[in-house]
Each structure stands twice: as C-alpha cells, then as structure tokens.
Amino acid sequence: MNHEAIKKAGEIIASKANYVGGGMEGYAVLALIDENGYPSASALTIARADGIHWLTFATSPDSNKAKRISKNNRASVCIASSTYNITLVGIIEVVDDLEVKKDMWFEPMSHMWSGHEDPNFYAIRFKTERYNIFVLDGENVMEAVGVL
C-alpha cells in the first residue's frame, strides 16, 4: 500500500468538497447500476469527505440515484484530471439524518433545496472498500491499489 498516494488522493478529494468555482473542477463521477442492470454515471459535487474513506453527496429522496441505491448499494466514484485518477469502489446509502445533512450543507445547495432541514434534501454516503489511485505530483508518480 502506498501511503503517500492515499494521502495525496485524500487531499485532492478534500479540495473538491464544496467546490463552487464552476466547470468540472469540483465534481466526482458516481457510477450506480440502473433498473435494467446497466451502469449509470452522474457527475456530482462532493459535499464532505474523510480522505478516501467516505464521501457524501446530495440528492432528493425520489431521484433516480436514490431509487437505484435502494435496489443495489454497490457503487464506484471516480475523480480525475490530467494529473490524477482516483477510483473508489464500495457501498452507498441514502441517509436522512439531520446531523449528517447539517454537516454537509453548503450555500450553493440552496439553488436546489431550502436548507439542511428541507424534506427533499437527503445525503448520499459512499464508503470505500477498494481503491485504485494514480497521482502525478510534479515528476513523482504515485500509485496505490488496495482494500480498506
């Protein structure tokens, strides 16, 4: 296990959480299995994260993502650029816990929901089980593949 690569990946993910600069810079791609058994990917803003261990995103309880998660809780998250590719595989759940939602709330979410107490605002919590990390840091290439 390459601790440097894991640490750097965690720093990259942290820099993406609550990103409001526009473009794809703050997004992660979440892959779920749809109702027909096919992969379905969505670009989402990371609300909160703990390194590569867990990430949270926002959704509504009646969204396609919430429906897919209720049928199959296996997921993958990919955060990539020209200098890194962080692919995480794990389990995911829809969470309606006020403390979790309060912790992950940030102001740009107000274009979709009225606040962390909005009944249509739910958290999606992804927990990593496996990872595949590639980071180019200057001339230093860091790679790590493993299980948490």
Residue ranges and their predicted role:
Residues 1-7:
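Short, low-complexity N-terminal intrinsically disordered segments enriched in polar/charged residues
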Residues 12-35, 75-77:
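A short, Trp-centered hydrophobic/proline-enriched beta-strand micro-motif
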Residues 23, 39, 70, 85, ...:
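Short solvent-exposed loop/turn micro-motifs enriched in small/polar/acidic residues
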Residues 25-53:
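N-terminal leader/targeting helix
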Residues 30, 69, 123:
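ATP-grasp fold ATP-binding core
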Residues 32, 59, 79-81, 90, ...:
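Residue-level recognition of conserved beta-strand positions in structured domain cores
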Residues 45-82:
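A short mixed-secondary-structure module that forms the rim of ligand-binding clefts
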Residues 87-148:
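Charged, gly/pro-rich active-site loop segments
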